[in-house]
Amino acid sequence: MFLAMNRFKIVKGREEDFETIWRERDTHLQGVDGFKEFNLLKGRSEENYSLYASHSIWQSREHFVNWTKSEAFRLAHKNAGKNADIYLGPPELETFEKTL
């Protein structure tokens, strides 16, 4: 099992905008080889931002990497540059492999 998480710092007061973007977007993940599960998680709120993480589970690192090179990935991220004003910076990718 392989887990990929992108952490997003969202400008305070723009949380609903961010959640709407994710609720309404097509992730193009269904049917992708090795894809298991996706969740959008909300974390702590700080003075000037709220923390979110997109959380996807894959059969293996190889499946995740293959997806990042696919047309499905390009389609899922085609509007990534829009709404830049709601982010405090670029997302931070963190990846994990199951050990136990």
Regions found by a protein language model. Give the residues of each.
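Glycine-rich beta-strand-turn "strand-cap" elements at beta-sheet edges
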Residues: 2, 39-48, 78-100
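Short amphipathic alpha-helical/adjacent loop interface patches that line ligand
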Residues: 22, 26
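Short amphipathic alpha-helical coupling segments at ligand-binding clamshell hinges
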Residues: 17-21, 67
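Short, well-ordered beta-strand segments in beta-rich or mixed alpha/beta enzyme
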Residues: 3-8, 39-70
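Short, surface-exposed ligand-recognition loops at beta-strand->loop->(often short) alpha-helix junctions
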Residues: 10-18
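An amphipathic, aromatic/His-enriched active-site/gating alpha helix that lines ligand/cofactor pockets
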Residues: 27-36, 57-92
